[in-house]
Each structure stands twice: as structure tokens, then as C-alpha cells.
């Protein structure tokens, strides 16, 4: 969890809590890897929000709350502000928002980044007001976006390769918070 801009890990069984980050800047928007050994987060470093990961390094240590050695690594560091990271279901890629409105994906092996949903499809009033979710198979994103140059959000499917965007709702009303079932 995040409190006062720092990341903490807590055991639900033993009421133990450990501070994971300890920086003068903020961290937020955490996302766990499927094996639970890595946490993605947005961190404010050098006057810019970027994407980082922190991992357990010792094989015998299974939980962040009881870890002794952690390794922090930058994932996406650019002049642009980047937020809301999320691991792909297979853990090989990281989705994130650039400048609050552009959905992008970074391949962890190649470090290449591709655009999934362009800026023209979103508008942000504040941090965290944009949502997206990987499909269970990692081939699509469920998104809320602004088609047709209007301000009512529709729910869409955006392909993970960034080549297709399908409007699922075609509604004249505001649609928001879609979920995979």
C-alpha cells in the first residue's frame, strides 16, 4: 500500500509492516507481478514522474514485509510524465499512461515502447481519472475513451499491438469503469 508517498508491505497474518521505499519524492500507482516478487510503481525522481520496479532479490525471501534486500530499477524514464503502470498477464510487458492520457506499452526485454491509445482519445482532469485494464490473454485493453470529438466516454477494446480500437458501447451517454468478467 502507499501512505504519505511511500510504499509499504504488510503481512495479513502477522500484522508486520515494512517500509519498501524511503525517498524524499513520492511513489504511487503500485502493481504486483503475477508471482508477487516485483512491484511496479510510478515514482517522482529528478522532477519527473517515471515508472520503476522494486524486486525481492533473495530466492528464500517470499514476502516484501520480511525482505532484507530489495532491488529498484527504472523501467520507463523519459522527460514525459508517466503513471499507472500495470504488468501484462505474462509479465513480459508493462502498460502505463504517458502525460495522463496516452496509453503505451513497454516491452521489458527489448525496452521498446509502442502507443496503444493516442492523446486525441482522452482528456484528463486529474491524476488517476483514466482507466485501462489488460485482457486476461494480454491481447487487448479495456479502455474508456472519447470518440467522435465529444466529451462522453465510451468503452472500447484497444488491441495490445496498437492497431485496432473497437467501440463497444456506441452510446450517447457517459460510460465508465468497464471490467473483464
Residue ranges and their predicted role:
Residues 67-72:
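Asp-box/WD-like beta-propeller blade repeats and closely related beta-sheet repeat scaffolds
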Residues 2-8, 12-14, 19-28, 34-65, ...:
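A flexible loop/linker signature enriched in serine peptidases of the S9 family
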Residues 164, 176-177:
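Hydrophobic alpha-helical and helix-loop surface patches within well-folded domains
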